[in-house]
Amino acid sequence: MGSLSNYSPVMEDVQAIRKAQKADGTATVMAIGTAHPPHIFPQDTYADFYFRATNSEHKVELKKKFDRICKKTMIGKRYFNYDEEFLKKYPNITSFDEPSLNDRQDICVPGVPALGAEAAVKAIAEWGRPKSEITHLVFCTSCGVDMPSADFQCAKLLGLRTNVNKYCVYMQGCYAGGTVMRYAKDLAENNRGARVLVVCAELTIIGLRGPNESHLDNAIGNSLFGDGAAALIVGSDPIIGVERPMFEIVCAKQTVIPNSEDVIHLHMREAGLMFYMSKDSPETISNNVEACLVDVFKSVGMTPPEDWNSLFWIPHPGGRAILDQVEARLKLRPEKFGATRTVLWDCGNMVSACVLYILDEMRRKSVADGLATYGEGLEWGVLLGFGPGMTVETILLHSLPPV
């Protein structure tokens, strides 16, 4: 019997192996699951809670300003993994800049994979196949950096097989929901039979802090961000009658907007994650988004549509002003961002998990309304992630009919 050391495969053998490794079809989204922590906070009374919980009620004028900011966000409520009683145990967290990273880490390190696992369980149940058939796990979060990392902890909580291929995407921010879909596409299409579990989970306590007159960026962040997790099952060549594909991930591209690094940036300090956001962020995004859209269409040999209203839209809701300016720049009808504005109203900005929530909202409403596709009855659409860098993720989607 010959040994492998004496065997020299010819190029045709390698090409045949490579061809056999690849899937035949495009990556598809087959299932979606979401999860919230238990505590719900109405936005119209959030200023009262926030200033009380941070022992800042004496800052009367700052509270009035923060309340006005909250009421302009177009957010109705948000979910958090903490309540006032919980925060009272951590005066260092509710201060503005006292050392608190150890306590924040102790909350986030177990909390992030646990919340992500809740969303994953729902996605796996909807998918309808055994969890042992999951071949890859992509886990994304902007908090709780640790080793073993959150992907390991989530896989352990779910009881995934020990040889699942894991990937952890840390500290990418609000564009990362698009990033993980790009990764999932490459994994599914380059590994025949792969089923990729994608999980995004975010907890805002990594950056929660008391108000400060000299750092209003902090007030904006505290008015926008909420906790949540979302999960997808992504795979190519769906099994007919067993798996139900909803969206084909046709193309996924990332673009860094030149000279925009200071528009949105965050920094981990002993006092937790510090948030900085320029007033120029809506204009920076809206001035560059059309070029990203044109690029993704041309990269697959398609002519960009003359009217952007012919597509369905899943933009990340970085905030009301960003949505308003992108909508105006692309001359979109108000209803085109309907799914995004619904999620923003119901949950706030959940960082990387947000666009996956919007995907879920769109497909559910499309089915409820009896439309021809999961994408509001339209075939083609785009998912957009915006975040630090400034970085834009542009995902071209093809929507399929409900089964």
Swiss-Prot record:
Chain positions of site Determines the polyketide chain length and product specificity: 207
Ligand binding (CoA): 281, 318-321
Keywords noted in UniProt: Acyltransferase, Flavonoid biosynthesis, Transferase
Pathway: Secondary metabolite biosynthesis; flavonoid biosynthesis
Cited InterPro entries: Chalcone/stilbene_synt_C, Chalcone/stilbene_synt_N, Polyketide_synthase_type-III, Thiolase-like
Active site per database record: 174
CDD domains per UniProt: CHS_like (cd00831)
MF GO annotations: acyltransferase activity, transferring groups other than amino-acyl groups
Swiss-Prot/TrEMBL GO biological process terms: flavonoid biosynthetic process; polyketide biosynthetic process
Top-tier EC class: transferase
Top-rank taxon, per record: Eukaryota
Record's keyword annotation contains Cell division: no
Its EC number(s): 2.3.1.-
One Pfam family from the record: Chal_sti_synt_N
Family the entry assigns: Belongs to the thiolase-like superfamily. Chalcone/stilbene synthases family.
General remark: A.arborescens is a medicinal plant rich in aromatic polyketides, such as pharmaceutically important aloenin (hexaketide), aloesin (heptaketide) and barbaloin (octaketide).
Purpose: Catalyzes the iterative condensations of 8 molecules of malonyl-CoA to produce aromatic octaketides, SEK4 and SEK4b, the products of the minimal polyketide synthase for the benzoisochromanequinone actinorhodin. May be involved in the biosynthesis of the octaketide barbaloin.
Oligomeric and partner information: Homodimer.
Protein name (record): Octaketide synthase 2
